[in-house]
Amino acid sequence: MSRRPVWIDGSDMRPAPLRTAAWLRACLLVGLSTLAMPGWASAPPCPQMTPEAMQNDYQALDARIARWDRAYYRQGQRLVDDGTYDSAKRRLAHWAECFPLLAKPSVNTHEPTGAKHHPVAQTGIAKLPDRDAVAGWVARQGDHPLWVQPKVDGVAVTLVYRHGRLAAAISRGDGVSGQDWYTKALHIAAIPSHLPADAPPLVILQGELYARRTAHRQSRDGTDGARARIAGLMARDTLTDREGSTIGLFVWAWPNGPDTMPERLETLAGWGFGDVAEMTHGVATAEDIAAWRQRWYRHALPFATDGVVVKRGDRPPGSDWQASPPDWAMAWKYPAREALARVDALEFSVGRTGRIAVVAELEPVLLGDKRVTRVSLGSLAHWRRTDVRPGDQVRLRLAGLTIPQLQEVVVRTRPRPQVDAPEADQYDRLSCLRFTPACRDQFLARLEWLGSDEGLDFPGIGPATWNQLVDAGLVKGLLDWRTLDTAALEALPGVGKKTARAWQRHFALADTRSAVRWLRALGVPAVPRQALTDALERYGMAGLGTLAPPDWRDYSGIGETRAMQLTRFFRDTDIRHWLASLESTRALQKQHGTNTRNEQKGDVRRVDVKQDNGTTWLPEQDSNLRPND
């Protein structure tokens, strides 16, 4: 089936005259810096847009991210999946690199910082996209010991113990300061109010508050709203003991603890934080990390996770930590089930029954472990309602394991590009029975159906064959293949005598197919098999055009709408002509008692034609003709 891609109008690409020189200098600098970056070939290209259009899209996406942040940090509502959020942040950063003269600092509403300063900064963590990036990071760590932990899906907290007593609990905030969560922490049973007597006078722990789960399998259960639930609870003015009992704690850092990971884990386990010791493992290669990532993704855990974290065991002292991702730790998240994607083009295709389908061609994006480049937008009417255009940023989600679906348009590019879409009223069940350039999609779809096992069953004759016959001008009407001779077929490029004769044998066998099967191949509207068989027995194929809607309604299972469709179908000029020709051929076959053998590659298949007033029976299990849509 041919494609009709629609691109943003080239006239929209011209930069404003007053900014042209600066624009070109900026783009040149960005281009040179991109070429110098390792792995530059995998980076998405910079959008080809005017400065004004780019600024509009940048501000629109920045505003949407700010809205997500406000909902998450202030109301505890998670409006989008992490995959969408992360890809939106990456896209914004990419645009800022592409257009440094236009980009403005992102105004994101992070968790309210409050007045409590972290004694050691919460660093955040760099997220690596794939195994190759992980392997590169591992190689850069040299001989430093590496440890892997599950990346718990919750909210970060800093706990401060002075002389064994809990003295402070601080939300992450901006990594430097956060909200005072001390009062709420006293209601969370997982946070001990005291440490053993042998604890150092000052203990600073960083960890994740998470929603307790029983046998949570990330591959099966997903995030399950776990992080949003905890964010919502901690955003409340008060927390009850009952609510606190649903919250767990995973300590992932002891900034002022012993120098080595084994020492830290042993002490933490002795203090009651045994889960961190059980779920922290030494690794040496990207393969080791991948194995733990897969294990924790598939196996039951007491919390939701969204990947793994790997860090050096001998990291710098906490006094050197900053509120930015360090080079001694990284995260490798699970495959995203949601992501943001840019629409590059729209493709319109007309199906066999005249239904117009719309597909968006995308800038490649990873969903699950799939590289997604296309997503269905449904029918022409549905596309018009969603109004997706090239340049738009859309949110995708995996349905099941493999099928991407459009969830919403996150950013509508401005100005809106013009789209040359086909008109729905140009195509229907009886359009394109003959080839014209505007009919190519539907005509080829008709031929493909006709030759499939749903139609006349031509083994080995598929879309490529029909394309070749149409392009050569040999098939201009739906049944022109019936009159092709061997010489015409052999003249086609790449088609030898053997192939030409095989095609002709299949074409010749079509005359032995049942009348019901022929009608289905031609695209008759869906109708109860018994009704069509009865009508054929009474009127024959050529006589069906004499029936009016009331005649069809006399048959069981046929209502007013279907009766009108059948009348229109059988009164079509081409359909009537073809049915008359077929009935004439079948009458001659019946007169001569045709028996046909199909010999192909040593397989002899006997085709016995059982005639019954010009009809034969389809398999018993096929009690109704299948719908044509």
Swiss-Prot record:
Transmembrane segments: none
Compositional bias ranges of the Polar residues kind: 588-597, 612-629
Biased composition regions of type Basic and acidic residues, renumbered to the chain: 598-611
UniProt keyword Signal present: no
Active-site residues annotated for this sequence: 151 (n6-amp-lysine intermediate)
Ribonucleoprotein in keyword set: no
GO molecular function terms listed in the Swiss-Prot or TrEMBL record: DNA ligase (NAD+) activity
Region of interest (Disordered), ranges: 588-629
Entry keywords, A to Z: DNA damage, DNA repair, DNA replication, Ligase, NAD
Domain of life, per lineage: Bacteria
Enzyme Commission code(s) on record: 6.5.1.2
GO terms classed as biological process: DNA repair; DNA replication
Catalytic activity: NAD(+) + (deoxyribonucleotide)n-3'-hydroxyl + 5'-phospho-(deoxyribonucleotide)m = (deoxyribonucleotide)n+m + AMP + beta-nicotinamide D-nucleotide
Gene3D superfamilies in alphabetical order: 5' to 3' exonuclease, C-terminal subdomain, DNA ligase/mRNA capping enzyme, Helix hairpin bin, Nucleic acid-binding proteins
Enzyme's top EC category: ligase
Stored PANTHER family: DNA LIGASE, DNA LIGASE B
Family the UniProt entry places it in: Belongs to the NAD-dependent DNA ligase family. LigB subfamily.
HAMAP family with a match to the protein in the record: DNA_ligase_B
Biological role stated in the UniProt entry: Catalyzes the formation of phosphodiester linkages between 5'-phosphoryl and 3'-hydroxyl groups in double-stranded DNA using NAD as a coenzyme and as the energy source for the reaction.
Protein name from the UniProt record: DNA ligase B
Species this chain originates from: Chromohalobacter salexigens (strain ATCC BAA-138 / DSM 3043 / CIP 106854 / NCIMB 13768 / 1H11)
Protein's gene: ligB
